[in-house]
Amino acid sequence: GEDTFRQLCAYYDSIYDQADNKNCSLSDINGIAYKDKESKKIIFTEPRSIMDMSKIPFCYDTIDDFSNRIIYYESSRGCPFSCSYCLSSVDKSLRFRDIELVKKELKFFIDQKVPQIKFVDRTFNCNHAHAMEIWKFVKENDNGITNFHFEISADLLNEEELDLISDMRPGLIQLEIGVQSTNEVTIKEIHRTMKLERLKEVVRLIQAGGNIHEHLDLIAGLPYEGYDSFKKSFDDIYQLHPNQLQLGFLKVLKGSYMFNHAAEYGLIY
């Protein structure tokens, strides 16, 4: 995490400072692996404790000009779900930044009239109270300029959330909705807990409001999704008429369930 990277940077910086070089060692940095110069062995240091999200420093207050900038912001880290292609499924922990701290930082961006803030929370609306608190805040503090981007699971949205976002200024928020596939066999195999018909219903309800840009995602190359199946997935989503349809290709990430079962699926990458 951030502490590990900071210490690693300090170590390499010290290499150029002969006075401090003797006091720094990779073995003192928890949470890394490195190759020892002498033994040529791979050394694993002590694991590092999971960092408190609220202790991560806010670094954007050092920027003077926010015009034409996109800010990436994180109010939570981790995901409660187990999608097999995602590394978040390996670490089941889900933690949040203090909500009052989040509001303070978002107000800073709003006051600076940042054009767009992209939340990188893996599933922003996995916690109803957290999502509602932030959505209410951005609605109440709308400056008429800043746009907020959220990655959500559409089938999790309830009536209270839908009512709130339906009353927002057009362009205040945009929603990226991960579908990945409409093949039920594929959805089950990749461990997604997605209610497809509910997702379609929610997408149409949001469209009816005419105030929110919808961005729907698909992944090509998933297990049991051949050309014909993917064509159907594409057609199913295209027929929903999203503002944007994003097609990504499967990335087999080391350590993920997908990586460990790649041979079984016959994946070539």
Report each predicted region and the residues it spans.
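Short, hinge-like loop/turn segments at secondary-structure boundaries
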Residues: Y12-I15, W135-K136, S233, A262-G266
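Glycine-rich beta-alpha loop elements in corrinoid/cobalamin-binding modules
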Residues: G1-E46
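N-terminal [4Fe-4S]-dependent radical SAM core
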Residues: I29, A33-S75
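Radical SAM [4Fe-4S] cluster-binding motif and immediate context
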Residues: I56-A208, A220
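Catalytic cores of alpha/beta
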Residues: E161-I165, P223-Q239
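Proline-aspartate-enriched helix->loop->beta-strand connector
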Residues: G1, V114, P242-N243
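Flexible glycine/acidic-rich beta-alpha junction loops that bind and position SAM and/or redox cofactors
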Residues: F81, H128-A129, V185-I190, A220-D228, ...
